[in-house]
Every structure is written in structure tokens, then in C-alpha cells.
């Protein structure tokens, strides 16, 4: 970190008097390379809802900080995760998602692996001196099912997800009691030209909701909205009303609420008014100024109603582009000579619905990994 300004020990520790990271922290490849190792290679990263891996042979692939990962449910129903490369010469093994065969076959030299990662066959290995079959298996990494979702961790010494996000699963299930019944209904994939922290900053405040999200703000009432911080996660919640511009609520729903959870380091779980569906924003940082995002929408029913289809299109064509335009503009603006280098975090004493104290909390956590 020699070429990058060191952060003070108490950076953003007091949210009432706090400024954002110096702009270099959003643009520097040196900073990003440090965060790859200090944060993403040592944290539990949420990659999917459990329904995508519910049955034996189900698999998905994800790219996280340049690593290609495969998560697969074995014939024994055990969920496992591996680096998605052949140990022979490094060719990638599986692509996309779907149903794996009973063995994984490398497209390059046809080495085959069982779904537990062990080597099944390496052609001609009987004629290769001192061939070590035991050390020719796929390389595993940690995986855990938690709160209805699937998390991976590249740190072989990592403890459980609950240690990283204490009490999060309990609170999420209180907000949405049907998590385990959810099924993927839509996914919007964007390679967003913005640093991962810009995207989290944007999520962690509703100061922008009125000006930038008129449809959302017509339903979720910012004057009845709170933001609480917890250990490595935060919760934004508030009361909502039915809106023709966004969430059309069933009249039978009493006291409808919105819940928005951010979890370390960069996954956002939303339980919209009605509490019977969810949206999740998965962030997979690519480089200092690019973040691959999956915006997933989950319902309990497979055959969607017209209202659900209309809501998906509102997310696709209205709400999602609103946020993408914001973070992309910020990333460009951070590099302007007209930006003074840091922005004041607008925390108010009453911690109102438009207070930015959530950003200060997040940035303080990140700063602890830059010591």
C-alpha cells in the first residue's frame, strides 16, 4: 500500500463526523488487489439461493475475484465447492449451470472426476511413472448452506457463516418466512463499470430514494424508515403502502413492511412489502472499476401471475436501471478534477430514514482490512 494514502486507525469510527474513502480507494488497482486477498479471499461470499442446488447433480459456476468456482450437489446429496479447473493442465471443467453427469469430464484431455472431486480416471496414467492419483483430485474450498442461501469461502481456516454474520439468519427468516420455498424467477446480469464499494455505498442509504427512485418512494415511506447496524450486517426497514408505480399490495396484507439487508462484504437481500418474495443483489468484483452483478428475483410459485411478470419488468426497466445509472455516474465523477477527493457522509443525529450512517459503518469495516 506504499503508493496509496494510509487510512487513520479510527477511519469512519464516528459516523456523526465522517467522510467517504479518498477517491483512490475506488479507482486504484493496488487497492483492489489488496482487497481481493484481505477481504474476498477470507470472507464468506453468498453465491446463490439453495433452490438452484436442491437436487443431486445440480451445479452452478461463479467467478469470484478472478477464480472460477463450481458448486455441486453430489449423488450423496452433499453440497461441495471446488476450483473449477482440471489439476492436469488447468483447463476449466464445467460452464454455466445445470445438471451434471455422474462424472465430470475435462474437455481437454478427458480426465474424469467423481462429483466428490476425486479423480476417477486419467487416461494412460498406468504408464506414467510415480503418477499420484490421490493428489490429482479437484481442489476444494469451503461451502455452507445458511439462511436458505449458499456461501463459499476460499480460506481453508474459516469458521462458519454464523460467526461472520451473527443472528443474521434468524432476522432474515423473521422478515421472510418462506425463504426455503423460493425459486428463481428472473436474473439480470450486468458487468457494471463501478467499484464494488460504490455499489455498497449506494445501497446503504435511502437519502437518494426520493430523488432517484420515485416509484419505490411512492410505496416505501422514508418518513417511517429506519437503518440499524449489526455485526457485519445492517438492516433497513420501514412501512409501505400499495403503489401503482411499484408494489401493488394485496389488501389483506396488514402493516406491510420493507426489509433490506446488507451483509459483509457485498450481498444485499431485499424482502419487499408483502414478505412473500425476495430480490438479492450478488456482487462479484472483477477489477477496481468493474463489478459483475446478479440481480435475482425469487417467488414461491413457478407459474408466475401477470402481476408478478409486471413487477419483474418494473425491476428490469425502471428500478434496476435507476441504480445502475447512479453508480456508473459516481464512478466517472470520482475521477474528475472537480471532485475534492472525499464526500461528507450525511449522518443525522436522529438516524432518520435519510441518514447515511450505514455508509460510515461499512467503510469503517473495510478500513479495518487496510491496516
Curated annotation (Swiss-Prot):
Its cofactor is [2Fe-2S] cluster; Fe cation. Its EC number is 1.14.13.239. Residues 44-152 form the Rieske domain. SUPFAM superfamilies: Bet v1-like (SSF55961), ISP domain (SSF50022). InterPro entries: Carnitine_monoox_A, Rieske_2Fe-2S, Rieske_2Fe-2S_sf, Ring-hydroxy_dOase_2Fe2S_BS, Ring_hydroxy_dOase_asu_C_dom, Rng_hydr_dOase-A. One of its GO terms (biological process) is carnitine metabolic process. Composed of an oxygenase subunit and a reductase subunit. It is an enzyme of class 1 (oxidoreductase). Converts carnitine to trimethylamine and malic semialdehyde. Acts on both enantiomers. Pathway: Amine and polyamine metabolism; carnitine metabolism. Inhibited by EDTA. [2Fe-2S] cluster binds at residues 86, 88, 106, 109. Disulfide bonds: none annotated. Pfam families: Rieske, Ring_hydroxyl_A. Fe cation binds at residues 208, 213, 323. It comes from the Bacteria. Binds 1 [2Fe-2S] cluster per subunit. This is Carnitine monooxygenase oxygenase subunit. HAMAP family: Carnitine_monoox_A. It catalyses: (R)-carnitine + NADH + O2 + H(+) = (3R)-3-hydroxy-4-oxobutanoate + trimethylamine + NAD(+) + H2O; (R)-carnitine + NADPH + O2 + H(+) = (3R)-3-hydroxy-4-oxobutanoate + trimethylamine + NADP(+) + H2O. Signal peptide: none annotated. Belongs to the bacterial ring-hydroxylating dioxygenase alpha subunit family. CntA subfamily. The gene is yeaW. GO terms for molecular function: 2 iron, 2 sulfur cluster binding; iron ion binding; oxidoreductase activity, acting on paired donors, with incorporation or reduction of molecular oxygen, NAD(P)H as one donor, and incorporation of one atom of oxygen. Keywords: 2Fe-2S, Iron, Iron-sulfur, Metal-binding, NAD, NADP, Oxidoreductase.
Amino acid at each position: 500500500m506504499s503508493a496509496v494514502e494510509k487510512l487513520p486507525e479510527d477511519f469512519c469510527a464516528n459516523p456523526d463526523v465522517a467522510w467517504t474513502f479518498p477517491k483512490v480507494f475506488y479507482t486504484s488497482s493496488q487497492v483492489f488487489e489488496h482487497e481481493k486477498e484481505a477481504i474476498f479471499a477470507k470472507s464468506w461470499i453468498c453465491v446463490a439461493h439453495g433452490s438452484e442446488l436442491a437436487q443431486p447433480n445440480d451445479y452452478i459456476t461463479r467467478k469470484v475475484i478472478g477464480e472460477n468456482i463450481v458448486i455441486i450437489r453430489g449423488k450423496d446429496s452433499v453440497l461441495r465447492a471446488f476450483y473449477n479447473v482440471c489439476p492436469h493442465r488447468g483447463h476449466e471443467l464445467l460452464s454455466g449451470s445445470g445438471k451434471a453427469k455422474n462424472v465430470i469430464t475435462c474437455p481437454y484431455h478427458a480426465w474424469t472426476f467423481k462429483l466428490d472431486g476425486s479423480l476417477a480416471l486419467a487416461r494412460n496414467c498406468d504408464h506414467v511413472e510415480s503418477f499420484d492419483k490421490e493428489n490429482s483430485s479437484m481442489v476444494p474450498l469451503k461451502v455452507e448452506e445458511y439462511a436458505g442461501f449458499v456461501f463459499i469461502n476460499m480460506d481453508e481456516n474459516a469458521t462458519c457463516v454464523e460467526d461472520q454474520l451473527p443472528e443474521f439468519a434468524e432476522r432474515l427468516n423473521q422478515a421472510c418466512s418462506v425463504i426455503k420455498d423460493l425459486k428463481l424467477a428472473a436474473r439480470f446480469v450486468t458487468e457494471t463499470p463501478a467499484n464494488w464499494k460504490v455499489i455498497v455505498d449506494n445501497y446503504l442509504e435511502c437519502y437518494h430514494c426520493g430523488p432517484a427512485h420515485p416509484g419505490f418512494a411512492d410505496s416505501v415511506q422514508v418518513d417511517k424508515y429506519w437503518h440499524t447496524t449489526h455485526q457485519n450486517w445492517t438492516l433497513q426497514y420501514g412501512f409501505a403502502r400499495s403503489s401503482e408505480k411499484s408494489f401493488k399490495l394485496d389488501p389483506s396484507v396488514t402493516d406491510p413492511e420493507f426489509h433490506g439487508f446488507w451483509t459483509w462484504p457485498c450481498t444485499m437481500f431485499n424482502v419487499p412489502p408483502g414478505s412473500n418474495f425476495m430480490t438479492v443483489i450478488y456482487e462479484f468484483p472483477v477489477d477496481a472499476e468493474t463489478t459483475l452483478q446478479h440481480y435475482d428475483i425469487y417467488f414461491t410459485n413457478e407459474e408466475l401471475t401477470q402481476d408478478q411478470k409486471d413487477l419483474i419488468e418494473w425491476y428490469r426497466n425502471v428500478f434496476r436501471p435507476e441504480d445502475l445509472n447512479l453508480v456508473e455516474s459516481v464512478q466517472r465523477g470520482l475521477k474528475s478534477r472537480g471532485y475534492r477527493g472525499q464526500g461528507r457522509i450525511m449522518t443525522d443525529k436522529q438516524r432518520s430514514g435519510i441518514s447515511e450512517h450505514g455508509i460510515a459503518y461499512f467503510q469503517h469495516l473495510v478500513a479495518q482490512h487496510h491496516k
